[in-house]
Amino acid sequence: MALTTYDELKTSVADFLNRDDLTSVIPDFITLAETSLNRTLRHWRMEKRANAVADTQYTALPSDYLEMIRLSIIDSTTSTIENVGQFEISKLRAQNNNTTGKPVNFTILDGSIELNPTPDAAYDVQLLYYGKIPPLNAQTTSNWVLENYPDAYLYGSLLHTAPYLQED
């Protein structure tokens, strides 16, 4: 049994279930497996870098963002910006009278990176983060998870069939 492409995965799920009436929903089971993997898996192949210019209090996160590893200002002294909680950043901002300057803290808020203090100039920043697994579909027929861990996709997809088939 080959299990190296999206179509082969869909066929394998149908074969394991011994059902030919689920063809239209098998892609949903695969998507649910990917969602579960994105929530729990942290692998070096998920590590991504993104560069941005931070010149306002808020900077958008990459669309495939899952979790921050590190945020750094890239200049002559490359410095890491400390990750603090949302309450803590509000407290720090109030203590410093909402001043501007070179950011030293950040938090994640509403799909953005909130910097403190608010940048007083345009700073080049580099995000090191965990990104989502590239989703399988008709155009993207394989990815590193399917190539290296096909059992994770197969088992995850089959696991999500149980509620649908009322076998949970």
Question: Language model features by range: what are they?
Answer:
Residues 1-168:
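Glycine-enriched, solvent-exposed interface loops adjoining structured elements
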